[in-house]
A protein has these predicted regions:
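A short, Trp-centered hydrophobic/proline-enriched beta-strand micro-motif
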Residues: 26-28, 46
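Short, surface-exposed interaction patches in beta-rich subdomains
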Residues: 132, 138-141, 147-239
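Short Gly/aromatic-enriched secondary-structure transition segments
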Residues: 41-51
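N-terminal short leaders/motifs
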Residues: 16-19, 53-54, 77, 184-193
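Gram-positive cell-envelope targeting signals
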Residues: 1-8
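Right-handed parallel beta-helix
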Residues: 11-25, 34-38, 42, 57-139, ...
Length: 239
């Protein structure tokens, strides 16, 4: 792989610690290795790869400027092989920040209960999983991976996958949009057993034992207070 980015000379190589109060946004660019994000209320937080035997060029490179922490996979322009299992990333982040993750062939895990201003995850050939997220806005887009979500509280959430499945437990929200091509959508619960679901599909179907009212592609559960848009081609919706 060849990874290039601007202002390469402003980056520092290797595992590091940083002060939580100095960071309001974290950006991660990663490839062919897993990313685990943990949230902590500690004053000093750590960022580490799984193997310390990497060369300086192979190590993660990072920059902290104006409250934004950027983490790159390796030195800009480096081309070469990496030891197997050496590049799994574990990062601790503060509560309430903006988190942006862009990765290829990487599984992303947001572990434990986490609170953000905004979360954006873009992944190619990787799964995205979270245990519990509360954020004003959540955007998750993966090409061939699953979105395996736990509890989700968000003013607005957009979850998209091409050939993967989407599983979430929506707790509190104004609107959730879910899109798949060939994947299924699983809603583990509905807030107050209530939702207004717009389900657009070609060959998919609704699978539920809940009572509902139907009007064209709109399904009303309970009083219909919570709005969910689901768009699939051949995927089913189950709840």
């Amino acid at each position: 792989m060849l990874h290039r980015y601007a202002d390469a000379n402003s980056y520092t190589a290797g595992n590091f610690e940083y002060r939580a109060k100095d960071v309001s946004q974290v950006e991660i660019n990663w490839f062919s290795a897993d990313v685990t994000v943990k949230q902590s209320s500690a004053g000093t937080l750590s960022v580490a790869e799984s193997d310390r035997g990497l060369s300086e060029k192979q190590k993660l490179h990072w920059r902290l400027e104006d409250g934004k922490l950027v983490i790159q996979y390796c030195q800009s322009g480096y081309h070469g092989r990496f030891p197997s299992g050496a590049k799994d990333l574990t990062i601790e982040v503060p509560e309430g920040i903006q988190l942006d993750i862009d990765c290829v062939s990487s599984d992303v895990k947001l572990a434990g209960s986490q609170t953000y201003d905004k979360v954006t995850v873009n992944s190619v050939s990787g799964n995205v999983a979270f245990d519990e997220i509360a954020a004003d806005k959540v955007d998750v887009d993966t090409v061939s991976g699953d979105i395996n979500g736990g509890k989700l509280s968000s003013d607005k959430a957009d979850l998209k996958t091409t050939s993967g499945n989407v599983t979430i437990d929506p707790v509190k929200f104004n609107k959730i949009s879910i899109g798949t091509v060939s994947g299924d959508v699983h809603l583990l619960s509905l807030p107050d057993d209530s939702a207004q679901i717009q389900f657009s599909h070609v060959s998919g179907s609704l699978k539920t034992q809940r009572e509902y009212k139907k009007d064209a592609n709109q399904y009303i559960f309970g009083n219909g207070n919570n709005k969910i848009d689901v768009d699939t081609v051949s995927g089913d919706l189950s709840l």
